Amino acid sequence: MHLATETAPSMATYSSTYFNSSLHAHSTSVSSSNLAAMNSLDTHPGYMGNSLNGPRSMTTNMNSMCSPGNNIGLPYRVIASSMGPHSLPSPTILNYPGHESPPFNILNNVSCSEDIKPPPGLSSLGSPCMNNYSCNSPGALTKHICAICGDRSSGKHYGVYSCEGCKGFFKRTIRKDLVYTCRDSKDCLIDKRQRNRCQYCRYQKCLAMGMKREAVQEERQRSREKSDTEAESTSSTSEEMPVERILEAELAVDPKIEAFGDAGLPNSTNDPVTNICHAADKQLFTLVEWAKRIPYFSDLPLEDQVILLRAGWNELLIASFSHRSVSVQDGILLATGLHVHRSSAHNAGVGSIFDRVLTELVSKMKDMDMDKSELGCLRAIVLFNPDAKGLSNAAEVEALREKVYATLESYTKQKYPDQPGRFAKLLLRLPALRSIGLKCLEHLFFFKLIGDTPIDTFLMEMLETPHQIS
């Protein structure tokens, strides 16, 4: 779905005036944009058949819409200029994996791991990219390769050479007794680039490669014997990534429109998709302001900051307007103050993805009464994505994400001591957010290509530059 905000007057005015004044002012804002899932895509059969059957044709059509010499696009220029007079990263090409994009007639069956599929079953370990750590050959598992995702190993963890990311994932799964589901065929490819896409298949691969549950449990038992030390360590981690600063970032960019409630929300003569696009366009301008308030983000190299913002903007915007909409009945509340009702979304042909936002995000957030500190931590986890393509130091980003995990866990234990499973429930919203974000991004590209929906300048520029989906 799309995000929330007002339409930007003129790109020249907005980008030069707004960003040069506010982005240097250490403010921060991000919202989460979710675009529309089409229920009636058959209305464009010819176009769909010719242009949307594969990544090559999509790229060709998109590139043809870009102005010459503008390969990097406005988001790079605006974000980079707001962070300092540094050189911009080299432009990259929109390079989807070597397979066909999911057919648009199955958009409603979105999967968080549908982009790339290996041969059925874990036999995919025998593929060329996995031969370095094939099956039962200990010699093949070098100390430099993670047996789960192929990233650089940091040592042997729970019986298997693995990276810090897979080690932490396996430990959290066992300690929190998390149960995952695969939205696809339980045969998702797990590699460095997309290890976070399907938690079920990642966990199954951890087990298949030999990670031992009992090793985590034994480690936990030992840690209980050192509870004082652990408490001190947790306190130290919370100080490194203070939840107060994360909350401040959320409040600093809060559009302050909750007062509308369910009654008295402004109506609009525009269709829902147009309203959402306009709202998303405005919220994108506050993305940098929010991110710069998140601890340690501004300490990363400029190029990495740009990559992380561009890799996560859609999920960040979606999370924001979903949380903002918990008090709305059967609809979402945009940052512009406009209310988009479920019925109008269905009439506009975007009912399917709209319903997913309501049931998988808004409803869940409402049921658990998710507060803004928890929302901010989840969005910070999305922001610090070590799998974003092109990072100069993915390990550093991974470490920052782990700090946010620790901060969120500590916060939930202190604030909600009677809800021991709350931390796990919060983390389980991330796969749904990723899945919905990817599908909304596909629909945003579709709306852009068919030209039926006005997408404001900044959002259009964002789409015309390569987007790192990893």
Curated annotation (Swiss-Prot):
Signal sequence region: none
Keyword Cytoplasm attributed: no
UniProt KW Zinc-finger keyword: yes
Domain NR LBD stretches: 238-466
Gene Ontology MF terms: nuclear receptor activity; nuclear steroid receptor activity; nuclear thyroid hormone receptor binding; protein heterodimerization activity; retinoic acid-responsive element binding; sequence-specific DNA binding; zinc ion binding
Pfam families noted in UniProt: Hormone_recep, Nuc_recep-AF1, zf-C4
InterPro entries per record: NHR-like_dom_sf, Nuc_recep-AF1, Nucl_hrmn_rcpt_lig-bd, Nuclear_hormone_rcpt_NR2, Nuclear_hrmn_rcpt, Retinoid-X_rcpt/HNF4, Znf_hrmn_rcpt, Znf_NHR/GATA
UniProt-listed SMART domains: HOLI (SM00430), ZnF_C4 (SM00399)
Gene3D superfamilies reported for this sequence: Erythroid Transcription Factor GATA-1, subunit A (3.30.50.10), Retinoid X Receptor (1.10.565.10)
Ranges for region Disordered: 217-242
Region (Hinge): 212-235
Region called Modulating, residue ranges: 1-145
Listed CDD domains: NR_DBD_RXR, NR_LBD_RXR_like
Known role: Receptor for retinoic acid. Retinoic acid receptors bind as heterodimers to their target response elements in response to their ligands, all-trans or 9-cis retinoic acid, and regulate gene expression in various biological processes. The rar/rxr heterodimers bind to the retinoic acid response elements (RARE) composed of tandem 5'-AGGTCA-3' sites known as DR1-DR5. The high affinity ligand for rxrs is 9-cis retinoic acid.
PANTHER family documented for this protein: NUCLEAR HORMONE RECEPTOR
The protein's name in its UniProt record: Retinoic acid receptor RXR-gamma
Taxonomic lineage: Eukaryota, Metazoa, Chordata, Craniata, Vertebrata
